[in-house]
Amino acid sequence: MASKKGVRITITVECTECRTNTNKRSNGVSRYTTSKNRRNTTGRLEIKKFCPHCNAHTVHKEIK
């Protein structure tokens, strides 16, 4: 039997400033995993989170 897909899905959010910023504390790109509700949030998610590479709170956008 096939189970129904739930409404909540797991997504990955990535720092937008790590790609363009050259004055970073360390190399790399910050990524977090979180979940979102497909019915309530149909578009791409944007969250302000702490980036350890930029050493600041930056906007993290949802990636595929």
Swiss-Prot record:
GO molecular function, one term: structural constituent of ribosome
Pfam family membership, one: Ribosomal_L33
Keywords of the record: Ribonucleoprotein, Ribosomal protein
An annotated GO BP: translation
GO cellular component, one term: ribonucleoprotein complex
Domain of life of the native organism: Bacteria
Protein family per UniProt: Belongs to the bacterial ribosomal protein bL33 family.
Name recorded for this polypeptide: Large ribosomal subunit protein bL33
Organism in which the protein naturally occurs: Picosynechococcus sp. (strain ATCC 27264 / PCC 7002 / PR-6) (Agmenellum quadruplicatum)
